[in-house]
């Protein structure tokens, strides 16, 4: 066999392998839910959010921003949002972040205070540090919309 007859066969073989592997990949196309698992699934996330709410109430830096809010709705929406961001089966159906925060004039200090409280709430619920970092990484893209930058 010559080089010219091997080349088309080699290309055909590589194409077939790529199709098979591509097909296998699409069969396993579910999102990575390992973070969701590490957060304790929906129940664990709901516990973190509940503890976060208590921390917000006690935090003079931010509690005025949350005055008058529907606590049950906030709990439900934030739980859904964290569940979805962590790869869980939930779907966040609340308002868009930019719209929701447009009239709040949130400062860096307030944003950081909420982040600190979220970390404290996760620590209170024995969430591993690696999972905490992964969740914070998922939340970072929301920063410009929350701050209305």
Short names for language-model regions:
Residues 20-23:
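C-terminal motif of bacterial Sec signal peptides marking the signal peptidase cleavage site
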Residues 2-14:
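Bacterial N-terminal signal peptides that target proteins for export
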């Amino acid at each position: 066999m010559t080089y010219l007859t091997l080349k088309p066969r080699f290309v055909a073989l590589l194409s077939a392998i790529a199709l098979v592997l591509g097909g296998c990949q699409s069969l396993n196309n579910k999102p990575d839910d390992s973070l969701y698992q590490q957060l304790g699934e929906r129940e664990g996330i709901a516990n973190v959010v509940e503890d976060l709410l208590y921390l917000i109430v006690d935090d003079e830096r931010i509690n005025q921003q949350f005055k008058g809010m529907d606590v049950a709705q906030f709990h439900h929406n934030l739980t859904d949002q964290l569940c979805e961001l962590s790869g869980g089966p939930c779907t966040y159906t609340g308002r868009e972040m930019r719209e929701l925060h447009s009239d709040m004039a949130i400062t860096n200090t307030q944003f950081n205070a909420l982040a600190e409280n979220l970390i404290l709430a996760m620590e209170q619920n024995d969430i591993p540090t690696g999972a905490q970092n992964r969740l914070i990484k998922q939340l970072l893209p929301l920063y410009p919309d929350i701050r209305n930058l």
